[in-house]
From Swiss-Prot:
Main subcellular localisation: cytoplasm
Classification via Gene3D superfamilies: Aldolase class I
Enzyme Commission numbers on file: 4.1.2.4
Pfam families: DeoC
Keyword Cytoplasm: yes
Protein name: Deoxyribose-phosphate aldolase
Length: 221
């Protein structure tokens, strides 16, 4: 077990996420209030909640992130591009884009590259590509990671949380591929402080979780 007093400020790693399909304006307000109170650098909400989150966090040093093509990645590239541009116009500065898993499985490198690079170029925002590592072989993970880095992504993200969660093995694998070129966002099923520490030790530079408050309280307790 990793010691509780490890020299890590867990709050600074957290993308405070509220991605329940039943999210209400009151839920988004609570999410933003928690981010301010606990010092989370980012909130992650659905595209329909971006404008509200931006207004609530006006003047704060807290980024608003949203998801694109979520959670399956099966939208057409033009739809994803529109989603990304609209989210940017509404104030989002970070975009978590779901990769097209069918294209990864088929080895369609050019299509994947073109989709990600178009969004990177059109928005100029921080781009995190969700690879859904639980559904890919190691060969497919490597292919997807290398294409996304070449296309201009800023982060490789493990999972959407809909098809399993982040593992230490996958974070370490992606970190070894990236060699510091991009950040690694571990996401999905991060509920305990020990999990969080282990993922950070493996190379995660961001943690996407809806349990950020509990993690910080556990560290401070």
């Amino acid at each position: 077990m990793i010691e509780k007093n490890i020299n890590i400020d867990i709050a600074t790693y957290i993308d405070h996420s509220f991605l329940k399909p039943t999210a209400t304006p009151e839920d988004i307000e609570q999410c933003c209030n928690e981010a301010q109170y606990f010092g989370f650098p980012t909130v992650c909400v659905y595209p329909s909640a971006v404008s509200q989150a931006v207004k609530l966090l006006h003047g704060q040093k807290i980024a608003v992130c949203t998801v694109i093509g979520f959670p399956t990645g099966a939208n057409t590239s033009s739809v994803k591009l529109y989603e990304a541009q609209e989210a940017t116009e509404n104030g989002a500065t970070e975009l978590d884009i779901m990769i097209n898993l069918g294209q990864v499985k088929a080895g369609s490198s050019e299509e994947i590259y073109n989709e990600i690079s178009a969004i990177c170029e059109a928005t100029g925002q921080t781009i995190k590509v969700i690879l859904e590592t639980n559904l890919l072989t190691d060969t497919e993970k490597r292919l997807a990671a290398e294409i996304c880095m070449d296309a201009g992504a800023n982060y490789l993200k493990t999972c959407s949380g809909w098809f399993g969660g982040a593992t230490v093995t996958d974070v370490r694998f992606l970190n070894n591929i990236s060699q510091g070129r991009v950040g690694i966002k571990a996401s999905g099923g991060i509920k305990t402080l020990e999990q969080a520490y282990e993922l950070i030790e493996a190379g995660a530079t961001r943690l996407g979780t809806s349990h950020g408050v509990a993690l910080v309280q556990s560290q401070n307790g």
